[in-house]
Amino acid sequence: MPDDDLQHRSQDILARLAAVIESRKIAHGGDPTKSYVARLLHQGPDAFLKKIGEEATEVVMAAKDADHGADKAKIICEVADLWFHCMVALAHYGLTPDQVLAELQRRAGSSGIEEKALRKLLGRGSADQARESP
């Protein structure tokens, strides 16, 4: 099935990127003078979290521009930048893209409104769920 092939390739791309990011950690020999990822990780959470905020804003701006006739491909580029920096954050915190995909799979088919209400009722946010994921 084409959808299965796309899903497999997408997971493979995310897994390969996660492995590269992991290899850039200082503990694994990453050199902040030669690697952007190593530099972000070396600078700590403030550096990559700031980038996540910047990239999220750029996604919003690209989408707003697309509403006024700009090239929608810009949205894809900005989302790719956002995902990349989020993956740096995941690596820093010892988490993986597979855990995010598992959470999305868990939520598939459920009402977002009901999901949010349940988390609020249980006093749980997504951070608690991430800690419980394998």
Curated annotation (Swiss-Prot):
Keyword Hydrolase: yes
EC number: 3.6.1.31
Reactions catalysed according to its record: 1-(5-phospho-beta-D-ribosyl)-ATP + H2O = 1-(5-phospho-beta-D-ribosyl)-5'-AMP + diphosphate + H(+)
Keyword field contains Disulfide bond: no
One BP annotation, GO: L-histidine biosynthetic process
GO molecular function, one term: ATP binding
Listed Pfam families: PRA-PH (PF01503)
Main EC class the enzyme belongs to: hydrolase
SUPFAM superfamilies, per the entry: all-alpha NTP pyrophosphatases
Name listed for the protein in its UniProt record: Phosphoribosyl-ATP pyrophosphatase
